[in-house]
Amino acid sequence: MCSRILLSGLVGLGAGTGLTYLLLNKHSPTQIIETPYPPTQKPNSNIQSHSFNVDPSGFFKYGFPGPIHDLQNREEFISCYNRQTQNPYWVLEHITPESLAARNADRKNSFFKEDEVIPEKFRGKLRDYFRSGYDRGHQAPAADAKFSQQAMDDTFYLSNMCPQVGEGFNRDYWAHLEYFCRGLTKKYKSVRIVTGPLYLPKKDPIDNKFRVNYEVIGNPPSIAVPTHFFKLIVAEAPTANPAREDIAVAAFVLPNEPISNETKLTDFEVPIDALERSTGLELLQKVPPSKKKALCKEVNCQIVVRDFSNAAIKQSKDVKLLPPPKKRN
């Protein structure tokens, strides 16, 4: 799939309103303060609703309906969780040469677990993935969090997972993309990555109308299976010129399906504004265009095929190898 095909599908699928959770402490991820405040804007003075005894805000005395998004600050990443899809909206990482060089954690000591900070009725369950045909796909990779066991353990919360096709994607091309991101720390002293799911429309061949169609797993069905995933990469402070103020940027959108390792990574590159429209997120809006350089013009945006197979996956006793998913329409 080339970038121009992806662009045709990147239409407005907004993620919703702003965050309603605030962090109390960077290193205390479970200390989250809920602030579901009702709107404070005064009604239009031209509307004389008070004359007719109309007060819609009176509903708030029973509770504010939301939406509520769970913003959590872990050691290695920050995530914003979507209670409706039971997937993250986005996960934000920061990797450096120093963080990747550390070897203070072992994946075999980490286990997939439910995120009990999220209310039970809104969180993914371990049983939801069992025999679903999908991998529990890390959005912040465990391999990026070897600097502490706690950091690595945090990546195994299901709130950091999305259902991903295993063979040909999560265990292959997607893993190669994650390795590409880590490799950027050889040229840049700081690399920031935003990763998340997408639910993009597809043209119906019968009536030529675009529709969003995705599977939902679990019992009862509750976890949405993304059609695509995105990565926004921001590379800072090149080793050759660490004082440089501008940043090198690239955005990629990949389908949640097997991808041949022969496919060029640049085939999945998309403009940032197209990614914004498809996610409803504002990305790098504080950075002037003159300060944003094209990453793929500074480095060779190409995956390096490595044999990830299932070696790392088998190290965790909690991980079950899953059969391939049913083919989506």
UniProtKB/Swiss-Prot annotation:
The active site is at H138 (proton acceptor). It is found in: Mitochondrion inner membrane. The keyword Mitochondrion applies. GO terms for cellular component: cytosol; mitochondrial inner membrane; mitochondrion; nucleus. Coiled coil: none annotated. Its cofactor is Mn(2+); Mg(2+). One of its GO terms (biological process) is apoptotic process. One of its GO terms (molecular function) is DNA exonuclease activity. It is an enzyme of class 3 (hydrolase). Mg(2+) binds at N170. SMART domains: Endonuclease_NS (SM00892), NUC (SM00477). Its main location: mitochondrion. The keyword Thylakoid does not apply. Its EC number is 3.1.30.-. CDD domains: NUC. It comes from the Eukaryota. This enzyme has both RNase and DNase activity. Belongs to the DNA/RNA non-specific endonuclease family. Present with 3870 molecules/cell in log phase SD medium. The active site contains 1 hydrated divalent metal cation that has only 1 direct interaction with the protein; all other interactions are via water molecules. Homodimer. This is Mitochondrial nuclease. The gene is NUC1.
